[in-house]
Amino acid sequence: MTNATSGAKRPAWLTVFGVFSLVLFGYGMYSALVVSPPDRNQGDLIRVMYAHVPVAWLGFAAVAASAVWGMLYLWRGRAVDDVRAQANAEAGLLFSALTIFGGMTYSKPTLNTFWTWDAKLTLTALMLALIVGYFIVRGLIEEPQRRARVSAVVMIIVLASLPFNYLAAEWFRTLHPAKSVNLDGSGVSMDPVMLRVLLINVAAAAAVFIYFVSERIRIGRLALTRGQMADAAQTASQQGGREVVS
């Protein structure tokens, strides 16, 4: 059995983890819709937060991971690092799009419009556009090494935009709600039940993220192995042809 053939079969741990992710996601949604109390000011609209915040955080994490793998490719030149960078970029594209959708869902009942040029929403849209640009670059460049180098640089640029996005609500006049969970050590201003439900959904989103990226890396490595085998076979065929001619 060749490596390419053995790699085509999904590992058992990945299947089990996929089921676990689905169960945890279902429990998170149940907690958001049933367990969590309505917010004192926003009522049941707060339930959007339990999906919106986790996908936003995981979108940032995906971009950061993709950029790190891109940097490692620029340093080491290993094709598998580019595969990992692309897999995380795909997750970043998905989660960033879901972040904007969640923001628009929240905006409609509160501001009576799906879209405003709010700093936070606009910067997230810009980040999504840059990620789309990453995949456009990958589609336009055929030579694998050059494609990996250029796309790595693009993702590093996307990474540089993250601090502006994260701090937009503090730096600019924005319609985005104030943070209830602060990373600066100032604590948490949230009902304990709501916080527990939020953390459950963050864990669920993280599990889905890990499963998605792991599956995409598996498929990418399989395609990489098959491509390398095809190149080796073509090289051997050409060398055999030259020997016959000589």
PLM features: residue spans?
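Polytopic transmembrane helical bundles with strong interfacial aromatic enrichment
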Residues: 1-246
